[in-house]
Design a protein with these regions (language model features):
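Basic polyanion-binding and macromolecular-assembly surfaces
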Residues: 1-39, 45-391
Length: 391
C-alpha cells in the first residue's frame, strides 16, 4: 500500500492540576519560543492511552510491559492447569524466557564439545574501573539484565504456556521461544514499538509517534498551601496534623500524535485484525485519554476543546510552530486565540512546505479546509477513509 499518515491535533484546556511531575514533585515544564510552558511527557500520555485501549480492544489483542514476564507466563500455565505445581511452572518459565538474548543451549553443547569455547567463560573475571579483578562479573551483569521492562503480548504469554505443555515441562529450544516472541504482536506493541537491547531481532518499530504536550502560552507554577486536620485530636491538640504544599499549574495544551498506517499494517501482519479499527481505537484513545497524576486532588479530567484530524500521503506534519510565539489570553481566555493561531499556521505550512491533507476533519469548532463533525461522525468518516486506502 501507499504511504498513509493520520495526524491528530488536539487543543485541550486543563484546570489547576499536576498531570505529570518531575523528580521533585513539580509539574513538568519546557522552554519553547523563549517562554516557560506546561508540559506533559509523551510516555505519560502513551501510558494513559494504553490503559484506555481496553475500552476499544479485546484484552487478548493487547500486551503488558512488565518486569515480571516470567511470573506472567507461570500464571498462564496455572490458569490452563490449576493442578500444576506453581514452582515447577515458574522455574520452566524462567529458563524458557531466559533464552532470550542467550545462545541456544543445544548449539552451545555442540560448541563446547568441539572445544571452541573457553572453559568457565560464563564465570570469567572482569576488571573494575581501577583494573582490579572481580569474580563472576558476567553472571552479575546477566542478572542485572533481567531487571528490565519487557513488552510481551497476552497472546505471546499464552503461546509460551502452550509450549510448556507441548514440551511436557522440558526446556524448549531458543528457536521455538523466538518464534513465539516474533509472532503474535499485540496492538500496543505494533503502535508504540518494542526495543530488546539483548535480542534486537525482537525489536518492533513503532507505527505511532506521540509528542510531548505543551501549553500554547506561558505558564508559571503555583503552590497550594494546605493543612490536614486531625479528626480525633488530643485535648490539648491544635487540630492541624500536617502542613504541606502541592505544586500545580493550569493551561491550554497543544497535543499531537501521528500514525503511520502502512507501518501499522506491516507490524500486525497476518493477525486478522481490521487495521481501520485499530486506527480508530488509537485516535479515540489519544483524544479522550488523560494521565492520572494527582487526579484525586484536582479532579482535572476534561475533554478537548478541539480535535483536528488529517489524512496525509506525504509525511506527518506537527503544527506546534503555531505556538512558538506564546498565545496571549483574550477576554475569553486562551482557547479561541489558540485555535486561530493553529489555523493560520496550518494554512501557511500547506501553502509553502507541505501539501494540504487528503482529508481533514475537525471536532468542536470550525477550521479552514476541514469538515466539521462530532466525534462519532469524524471517527466514522476516518474509518471509511482508511478502509478505502487499504483496499
Amino acid at each position: 500500500m501507499s504511504n498513509l499518515y493520520v495526524d491528530v491535533h488536539v487543543l485541550q484546556t486543563v484546570p489547576p492540576s499536576c498531570l505529570n511531575r518531575d523528580d521533585t514533585g513539580s509539574p513538568k515544564t519546557a522552554v519553547y519560543g523563549g517562554a516557560r510552558r506546561a508540559r506533559v511527557s509523551s510516555p505519560s500520555w502513551k501510558r494513559a492511552m494504553r490503559r484506555n485501549f481496553s475500552e476499544y480492544f479485546d484484552r487478548k489483542y493487547l500486551g503488558l510491559r512488565t518486569l515480571r514476564a516470567v511470573q506472567l507466563i507461570a500464571d498462564r500455565i496455572m490458569e490452563m492447569d490449576p493442578e500444576k505445581n506453581r514452582d515447577e511452572a515458574e522455574a520452566w518459565a524462567a529458563k524458557a524466557f531466559g533464552l532470550i538474548g542467550k545462545d541456544d543451549p543445544e548449539k552451545k553443547k555442540k560448541t563446547d564439545a568441539a572445544g571452541t569455547e573457553e572453559p568457565g567463560k560464563e564465570e570469567a573475571d572482569v576488571s573494575d574501573t581501577k583494573g582490579n579483578k572481580k569474580p563472576g562479573g558476567k553472571k552479575k551483569a546477566e542478572e542485572k539484565e533481567k531487571d528490565v521492562l519487557f513488552f510481551i503480548s497476552c497472546a505471546q504469554a499464552d503461546a509460551m504456556a502452550d509450549l510448556f505443555f507441548k514440551k511436557k515441562g522440558a526446556v524448549p529450544s531458543k528457536t521455538a521461544v523466538m518464534k513465539i516472541m516474533k509472532e503474535n504482536i499485540s496492538i500496543d506493541i505494533a503502535l508504540f514499538g518494542r526495543m530488546v537491547a539483548k535480542e534486537t531481532s525482537l525489536d518492533c518499530e513503532a507505527a505511532a509517534q506521540v509528542a510531548h504536550a505543551i501549553s500554547t502560552h506561558k505558564v508559571a507554577t503555583e503552590y497550594d498551601y494546605f493543612t490536614a486536620v486531625d479528626d480525633y485530636p488530643a485535648e490539648d491538640g491544635h487540630g492541624s496534623a500536617h502542613i504541606g504544599t502541592t505544586e500545580f499549574n493550569s493551561s491550554t495544551l497543544y497535543r499531537y500524535a501521528s500514525l503511520n498506517v502502512k507501518e501499522l499494517a506491516a507490524n500486525l501482519g497476518e493477525s486478522g485484525l481490521l487495521i481501520e479499527e485499530v486506527v480508530i481505537g488509537f485516535v479515540s484513545a489519544f483524544i479522550l485519554s488523560m494521565p492520572t497524576g494527582k487526579q484525586n486532588s484536582f479532579a482535572n479530567r476534561t475533554v478537548p476543546d478541539m480535535a483536528y484530524v488529517t489524512v496525509r500521503s506525504d509525511q506527518p506534519v506537527n503544527l506546534c510552530g503555531a505556538f512558538e510565539e506564546p498565545v496571549k489570553a483574550g477576554d475569553d481566555g486562551y482557547v479561541q486565540n489558540s485555535i486561530e493561531s493553529l489555523a493560520k499556521y496550518a494554512g501557511r505550512v500547506y501553502a509553502d512546505f507541505a501539501d494540504a491533507p487528503c482529508k481533514a476533519y475537525v471536532v468542536g469548532t470550525d477550521f479552514d479546509g476541514a469538515q466539521r463533525k462530532n466525534l462519532e461522525g469524524m471517527l466514522g468518516a476516518l474509518r471509511e477513509d482508511v478502509k478505502a486506502a487499504l483496499s
